[in-house]
Amino acid sequence: MSYFTAREIASITIFAALWGILSTTLSPIFYKLFHLPFLCDLIGFTSIILAVWWVEKIGTATSVGLIATIINFMFRPTAMHFLGFSAASIIFDILAFTSGYKRLFEQKILGSILLTAISIISAAVAGVIIGALFMSPMALQRWGGVLGWAGLHAIGGTIGGVVGISLVNALISRGITPPKKRKKEGKD
């Protein structure tokens, strides 16, 4: 038996495609207008949170990040900075697993705080990698160096975390829950 079911793989690829396509189409426009990385983080961490909530298995965030990276490179082969988000998705995966999915998604207040913190940490890691390896020194200087760039990504991670958590809570309030939870509740 495989680790991910067919439905889980479909969910992972849908959220990865959402991230990959929106990042290749909208994020460059936002970045050119404002020179801020917030939209990349918002799209990425919202997609990851939704996928992890739906599947609740280690490897989900990593899979979403790697598939989104492949999609990104298919449309924008020179956008090497996206490798920072690949690393961030791995960090997110590890931190979400060690925090416990039950704690993240069944304890609303604690889960919201933890998911936001995980998004902030993961986004900051992406910012450090992108700043250290892929940004020009002139662009970095404007934002206070690598740490300043990591801070901007952390702000984007905060926004993405809040949006992702809000969407999860909105879906739950409308009765939309992952298949595993429906089986436990006898709704499937």
Residue ranges and their predicted role:
Residues 1-55, 59:
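Hydrophobic transmembrane alpha-helices
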Residues 3-7, 32, 36, 56, ...:
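Juxtamembrane/transmembrane-helix boundary motifs in multi-pass membrane proteins
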Residues 9-14, 42, 46, 58-66, ...:
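Hydrophobic alpha-helical transmembrane segments
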Residues 13-14, 21, 86-128, 165:
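Short helix-perturbing small/polar motifs within transmembrane alpha-helices
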Residues 25-37, 68-96:
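Interfacial aromatic-anchored transmembrane helix boundaries in multi-pass membrane proteins
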Residues 107-188:
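Membrane-embedded alpha-helical hairpins and interfacial helices in multi-pass inner-membrane proteins
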